[in-house]
Amino acid sequence: MAKNYAALARSVIAALGGVDNISAVTHCMTRLRFVIKDDALIDSPTLKTIPGVLGVVRSDNQCQVIIGNTVSQAFQEVVSLLPGDMQPAQPVGKPKLTLRRIGAGILDALIGTMSPLIPAIIGGSMVKLLAMILEMSGVLTKGSPTLTILNVIGDGAFFFLPLMVAASAAIKFKTNMSLAIAIAGVLVHPSFIELMAKAAQGEHVEFALIPVTAVKYTYTVIPALVMTWCLSYIERWVDSITPAVTKNFLKPMLIVLIAAPLAILLIGPIGIWIGSAISALVYTIHGYLGWLSVAIMGALWPLLVMTGMHRVFTPTIIQTIAETGKEGMVMPSEIGANLSLGGSSLAVAWKTKNPELRQTALAAAASAIMAGISEPALYGVAIRLKRPLIASLISGFICGAVAGMAGLASHSMAAPGLFTSVQFFDPANPMSIVWVFAVMALAVVLSFILTLLLGFEDIPVEEAAAQARKYQSVQPTVAKEVSLN
C-alpha cells in the first residue's frame, strides 16, 4: 500500500507543535531533521505512532523523524506546508556552557555538515569501484583516457571535499557560503598544493615571515569544518567594524585577508592534527585488538546509529581510504550489522500475524540486505519489538569477528549491502569475494534464526487498525496556517 505522504507530513507537523514551532527542516538519507523552537510543544507519543514514522530521535533543539528510504517524498510534502521565507528562530537566552553541551555541539556540527554530503561521497565511491572492476576485468586498460576520466569522476567528490564541507558547514553555521568556499578553495588550489609538496620535501615556505606547515588538504574534512566555524565569527566581527558605505567591497576583502591566512597558518594544520589523532586512536585500538575490534564494532553499530554517533567515523574512513586505499575496521563491521538487521526483519515478517507489520518488515529487510540502509529495519522493527534488536547485536558481533578474521577491507564508504558488496573485493586477494558473501549469508541466516529462537511480542492487528484510523482522521489544519509561497 502506497504511503499518503501529504497526510504523513500534516500529522508530523501537527505532532511537532505546528508550523510556528518549526524554525528549519532538512533531511538526510532516511530522516527528516526539524529544528524546533520549543521542545515542550512536541507530542512525542503521537509522533511515534504515526504510520510511516519508523522512529524519533531527539537532540537538543533538533527532532529527527525517521521515515526510511522514501524520506525525500515526505520532505517535499513537509516543505510545501512550511513558509517559503522561514527563518531560524532566535535563541531566547545564552545556554550554560558545559562539557556535555560542547560535546553535543561538536557532534551536531559534524553530523549536520556531513549528512548532506553523503550521496556525493557514495556516488563518487561507486564510480571509483566501477573503474577498478573495468580495469581488473580487462575491459579498460590502465592509462586509457576513458579509465582516467572515470577515475576523475569518482575522485572529484573526494579531492574537492574541503569545498563541499565548507559549503555545507556555511549553512550549518549561518555564514556566507561563497566566502567559505573561496577560502576552502585556497587549500586545494594547484599552486598551493605544489607549494605544500615543496615544503614536505624540506623547502622553507613562509607567509609574511611566518613558517607554513606542510599539509595536504585534499580528501580532508576537519580543517574546512573548523575554518568555516571560525569564519562565522570573523564575518560578524568584520561586519561590526566596517562603515556601511564600504561594506560591499571592504567587508569581503577583510574577511578573506583575515580568514585565509588564518586557515593556512593555524586552523588548517590544527584540523589535520585533530583528524590524524582521531584516526590514530581508532586504528591503534584496531591494531591491538585485531578481529575483536571489528566484532565489537559490529555489535555496537546499531546503537551508534540510534544516537547518530556513527557519523563521527565518516572523516576517519575517508582519510584512511585516501591514504591507504582501503578501510578494515568500521566498514567490515557494518556488513554484519546491516544484514543482521535485515535478517531479523525477515524473521519478523515470517512470524507476525499483523499484515501491516509484515509489510513494514519486508520492506525494511530488503532495504538493509540489498542497499545496506538499515534504519528502516532498526527503527521500524528491531527497536519497536526489542528482541529482534538483541538478535541483531549478537549476530553483528559474530559476523564482525568473521569479517575481521578474514581480513575484509572496503575500498569505498557506501553502506555495505548486497548491491555494494563490490567495494570489499580485493584484486590481491581473490578469496575476499567468497568471504564477503559468506559473511552476508551468515548475518542474514544467523539473525533470522536467533530472532525466531528469542521470539517477540507481536503487535495486535486491532492496535494497528486503530492507529491507521487515527492517522486517517487527521485534518489538514496545519496547511491553513501556512503561506504557500
Swiss-Prot record:
Record: active site: 28 (phosphocysteine intermediate)
Role noted for this protein: The phosphoenolpyruvate-dependent sugar phosphotransferase system (sugar PTS), a major carbohydrate active -transport system, catalyzes the phosphorylation of incoming sugar substrates concomitantly with their translocation across the cell membrane. This system is involved in arbutin, cellobiose, and salicin transport.
Domain of life: Bacteria
Subcellular localization, as worded in the UniProt entry: Cell inner membrane
Classification of source organism: Bacteria, Pseudomonadati, Pseudomonadota, Gammaproteobacteria, Enterobacterales
Sequence ranges assigned to domain PTS EIIB type-1 in this UniProt record: 1-88
Gene this protein is translated from: ascF
Gene Ontology BP annotations: phosphoenolpyruvate-dependent sugar phosphotransferase system; trehalose transport
Name by which UniProt lists this protein: PTS system arbutin-, cellobiose-, and salicin-specific EIIBC component
Record-linked NCBIfam families: PRK09796.1, pts-Glc
Domain PTS EIIC type-1, chain residue ranges per copy: 108-470
